[in-house]
Amino acid sequence: MTRRLVVLRHAKSAYPPGVLDHDRPLAPRGVADARAAGEWVRDHVGAPDHVVVSSARRTRGTWTLAAGAIGYIGAAGYDAASPGPLTIDPRVYDASAATLVEVLRELPERVGTALLVGHNPGCEDLVARLAAARDPDAARLLAVKYPTSGIAVLDVHVAWAELGAGTATLRRFAVPRG
C-alpha cells in the first residue's frame, strides 16, 4: 500500500511585540493563505486520515482554517481535545527532520494519508530527507524556497514505522495564496 504524506508549512505569521515565538498568531495574509492551502489540499489530495500539528499558535491556526476549507471539521472522529485523527504534538515545534521522522513513525498503519503542519527548516529538511525521487517540476519549485503555506505531497513506499531517508517520492509542491 502506498501511503501519502502532505507536509504543510504554517501560513504567514504576525510578529506582535512582546509575544513569544511559540505564541505568534497568523497575520491577515496568513489567514487567507491558510484557507487557500486547505482548498488546495481538498482539490488535489482530499481529506487526510490523520493530521499532526505543531503546538505553536500559528500552526494550530493554519490547520483550523485549512480544515474548514477541506471540510474536515465535523468529520466523524474529529475532536481537537482527544487523540485520533488530530494530534497536536509539541515535538513538531522547532523540530529537526530526524525528530519529524520519529513523530511520523508513530502514525497508525491504517492511515493512508497523513498531513503534517509544521515549521521551517524542519518541513524543508524532512521533504529533502524522505524524497529519493522527485517530480522535476515539484523539485524545481522546492529548490527555490519552501515559503509559508508551502505544501509538499509525497508518496511513501514503506510502512509509517519504517519511514526514513529515501523512502518517498515527491509528487507535487505548491504554494497556494489567498
What positions do the PLM features span?
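Short, glycine/charged-enriched secondary-structure capping and boundary segments
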Residues: 20-23, 65-69, 101-104, 129-132, ...
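A glycine-rich beta-strand to alpha-helix segment
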Residues: 112-133, 139
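Domain-level recognition of soluble alpha/beta enzyme cores
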Residues: 134-169, 175
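Active-site-proximal alpha-helix that buttresses catalytic centers in soluble enzyme cores
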Residues: 2-91, 95
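Residue-level preference for the first positions of well-ordered beta-strands
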Residues: 5, 113-115, 151
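Short phosphate-binding loop-to-helix
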Residues: 91-109
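Glycine-rich phosphate-binding loop signature in dinucleotide/nucleotide-binding domains
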Residues: 44-47, 107-111
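Alpha-helix N-cap/helix-start capping motif
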Residues: 56-57, 120-121, 148
